[in-house]
Amino acid sequence: MTNYFLYISTLILLISCEQNNNQQQEQQQENPTSDSLAVVNDPKNNLNIQTNSFSEIDSSGVLIFPLSMGESEREEGSLSYKEMPNNGYWNIIFYNSKTKEYKLLSERKMLIRNYDYKYGSGDNDNFSQTTNHIFYTVCTDDFNKDKKLTYQDPQYLFISDKFGNNFRQISPTNYNLNNWKFIKSSNKVIMTVGNDSDKNKRFDNSDEITTFEIELDKGVETNEVFEGDFKNKLKILFDRDWKRLK
């Protein structure tokens, strides 16, 4: 009797395993169709990577490819992605033509307005002897909360080395970059930045423009140049000389 029950149990187990195998085979046969539909319907398939232009950095063999992205319309004419501002890039590829290695500048969400690796190269001054950095003007924060990055959001000054490594922000957060200059003699970057003084989520002509500086290659934070007492003195002098008379 014991052998009989053992035989029955084994038979049931074998039948169950065979049914499971059949179900898995049926699912595998169905999956190619569903996977194909998923691929066709995936909006990423309508994206067209665009490396329109590239340049070499200081005869180093390292090339930089600013990235744009085109999108093919669906059959019904709809688009799946937000339109980027003109003359903006969403990332940059660094390609070493000697080693065939390549990398992205960063995987963070950003809008690159421009980049500069020849800054300070005028008057026959070799830029590679001036600094080993590339400078970028970048938007990373949706400051006005419109759910997209545009030139209405603050522009920050970023730097990296000439191979795209150590990409980091050097201008203060929530301040809009107005102007900047690399000072070779002090190895500093001096920048003027706008503060949204009236808290209207816009950077306009009435906002305060502040001056900051950072010494490169020192690992220090960006500091405001003019101290609070000096700025208060400027306001007192202006109030004395330019206040409207009643």
Features from the language model and the residues they span:
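C-terminal motif of bacterial Sec signal peptides marking the signal peptidase cleavage site
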Residues: L13-S16
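Residue position within the beta-strands of beta-propeller blades
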Residues: L63-L67, E71-S78, F135-T137, K188-V193
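Beta-propeller blade signature
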Residues: Y89-N96, T150-F163, S206-G219
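Extracellular-facing segments of soluble proteins and assemblies that are Gly/Ser/Thr-biased and enriched
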Residues: Y95-F158
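Surface loop/turn motifs at the tips and blade-to-blade linkers of beta-strand repeat domains
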Residues: S106-K109, I170-N174
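Acidic, glycine-anchored loop motifs typical of Ca2+
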Residues: N144-Y151, D196-N205
